[in-house]
Amino acid sequence: ASDGSENLLALAVEAARLRATLGEISDALEQKFGRYKAEINTFSGVYSNEMKNDVSFEKAKKLANQFSKNEGRRPRIMIAKMGQDGHDRGAKVVATGYADLGFDVDIGPLFQTAEEAAKQAVENDVHILGVSSLAGGHKTLVPKVINALKAYGRDDIMVIVGGVIPKQDYRYLFDAGTIAVFGPVTKISDTA
């Protein structure tokens, strides 16, 4: 199949008939063709252009600038999409907003595990790990990422959660160690 002369689907079906697992079939294809990796692109200036006369936007920018002066570097946030949550448009909008406020922003790839997100946050030396949750995995994944950060000795990294989070779950997330939870209508500048 690697030369492109045969139908991959037919070959995969035949392999399954011969008792190959889906994982084995996928691994064989990945070894030959590689794994798709989505490119993460963000834009700058869009949020700041729309919010330039907003009081909370200006206040958040001033706070970010003051942080930079005090700490010798800009505040750094990582936006993580963990588990099976592939809804990344909102996370990209949030990332753009934070960048326009003066933050250094890292965006994790889609479908990270809690361990992978924590590792990236530690390696990138972020101040804040923002978990974007739109698929209901917050009660499992957020405690896991907080525990993974603790295992790295980095419980100083603040964890915030944004997305479609039922109000009744907020207390659970706070008890797990989250410092803030933001719903869908929250202004980005108010979260900074």
Where are these regions (language model features)?
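Conserved ATP-binding TGD loop and adjacent catalytic N/P-domain core of P-type ATPases
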Residues: 82
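Catalytic-core signal marking the mid-to-C-terminal active-site face
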Residues: 1-16, 21-22, 28
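Cofactor-cradling patches in redox/metallo enzymes
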Residues: 91-191
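Terminal amphipathic helices with adjacent charged low-complexity linkers/tails
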Residues: 18-58
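Glycine-rich phosphate/diphosphate-binding loops that line cofactor/substrate pockets in enzymes
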Residues: 2-6, 61-74, 119-125
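Conserved beta-strand elements of the Class I
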Residues: 76-78
